């Protein structure tokens, strides 16, 4: 289990902040992170700070542009930080919404996945809720098209259980359909406020059956569970959100929930 650093993105923009943030997480008991939203810190310096704090990187989120146009440098950076799994955090708007756009998304990510695999790396895609919405021109969804048309050898998933749930699907069922294609799962929770608006909350305080998701992740032998909390932190403090959620994750792991 670990923390998706996008949760703490405002606290990893400089090398000193990255160091201080990792030290704080290590003190909590965190030994693994996902890197996302980090500032312009050279990979060598990132690695030194990671090693200093005894923390490993299980996966990253990087841009589609770098995957397509700067791949060699991107892979070199990942070699330096000791990570061979790279995620795309979201499909651009022009690559979703209808079958033609999704087809182009699949074509481009297939090429990326093949290029990465040829060099010993793996491509993964992180979902939101729009992948579970009906397309404009077909009685299907983007996620169904991905399931039907992507090649498991070159296209993996980073399933986000809150976004799956908010999109109207059962996270456990989706995890089972992704079997063998997941290395990292995102644990996230949310509520609907009095106006019906989505608001993220610390783990265990919302609508997602995280115990069922945890049991499914164990059954499917998914190696990593990362806590992610995009916005809406308690007291506007992402560290407080991490502390509350980390305690929940440890209780899950220890069978106390």
Please place each PLM-identified region on the residue numbering.
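Generic structural signal for helix capping and beta-alpha/helix-loop junctions
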Residues: 10, 42, 67, 95, ...
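Histidine-acidic metal/acid-base catalytic patches
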Residues: 1-28, 79-82, 140-159, 163-257
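Active-site acidic/histidine proton-transfer and metal-coordination neighborhood
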Residues: 23, 39, 56, 64-157, ...
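Short, well-ordered alpha-helical microsegments
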Residues: 42-44, 68-71, 210-211
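Glycine-rich, proline-tolerant flexible connector loops at the mouths of alpha/beta enzymes
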Residues: 34-50
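Active-site-proximal beta-strand/loop segments in catalytic clefts of secreted hydrolases
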Residues: 6, 36, 62, 89-91, ...
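Active-site mouth loops of central-metabolism enzymes
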Residues: 4-16, 60-67, 97-100
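A short acidic, amphipathic alpha-helical/loop segment
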Residues: 45-49, 73-74, 170-177
